C-alpha cells in the first residue's frame, strides 16, 4: 500500500511504503544480509529508557527515536556525516519509518539527537561497521574483525559528524 507523506513544511510530498509493524521489524533469521538489517538489529536491542526522545510532543516518541537512531547509524556507516544530508536521506527514502502526520526531522533535530543519544548512536554504528567488515572479509579484502578498531572508528565517525555540522553552522 502506498501513502503520501509530507517531506517538509512546503507542499512537496514523498511517497512512502507502509507495512504492518512486524514487517518493519527484523524479519530475517540468522545473520543480517543488508546494512539496514544490521542497523535495525542493533536498534532493536536498545532499551527505550536508554534513548532520549527526539520530540516530547510526538505521538510515539520512542518510535521516532528508533527511526532517527537507525538513520544516523546508517548514514555515518555510509560516510554521510552532515545532518542536513542525513535529513535529506530521510526525506527521500520511501522506507524511512515515519508517521505521516508528523514533520520529518530537520538537521537541527538530528544534531541534538546525536548529542543526547551519543552512546546509542555509537553502539548502532559499531554494529553497522561490524557488518561492513564482515562483508569485506567475505570478499577477501580483510582477514579478521578487530573489535577495538571498530569501536574507535565508530567514535571517529561521530566526531566527523559533529565537525561537519559545526563547519556548516559556521558557514551560516
Residue ranges and their predicted role:
Residues 96-102, 128:
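Catalytic micro-motifs at enzyme active sites that drive phosphoryl/nucleotidyl and oxygen chemistry
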Amino acid at each position: 500500500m502506498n501513502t503520501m507523506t509530507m517531506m517538509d513544511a512546503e507542499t512537496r510530498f514523498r511517497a512512502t511504503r507502509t507495512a504492518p509493524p512486524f514487517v518493519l521489524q527484523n524479519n530475517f533469521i540468522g545473520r543480517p544480509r543488508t546494512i539496514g538489517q544490521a542497523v535495525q538489529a542493533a536498534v532493536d536491542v536498545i532499551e527505550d529508557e536508554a534513548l532520549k526522545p527526539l520530540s516530547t510532543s510526538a505521538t510515539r516518541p520512542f518510535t521516532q527515536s528508533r527511526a532517527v537512531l537507525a538513520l544516523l547509524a546508517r548514514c555515518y556507516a555510509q560516510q554521510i556525516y552532515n545532518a542536513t544530508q542525513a535529513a535529506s536521506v530521510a526525506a527521500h527514502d520511501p522506507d524511512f519509518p515515519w508517521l505521516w502526520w508528523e514533520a520529518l526531522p530537520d538537521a537541527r533535530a538530528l544534531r541534538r539527537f546525536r548529542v543526547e543519544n551519543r552512546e546509542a548512536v555509537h553502539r548502532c554504528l559499531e554494529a553497522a561497521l561490524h557488518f561492513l567488515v564482515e562483508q569485506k572479509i567475505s570478499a577477501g579484502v580483510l582477514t579478521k574483525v578487530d573489535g577495538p578498531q571498530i569501536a574507535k572508528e565508530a567514535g571517529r565517525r561521530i566526531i566527523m559528524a559533529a565537525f561537519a555540522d559545526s563547519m556548516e553552522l559556521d558557514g551560516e
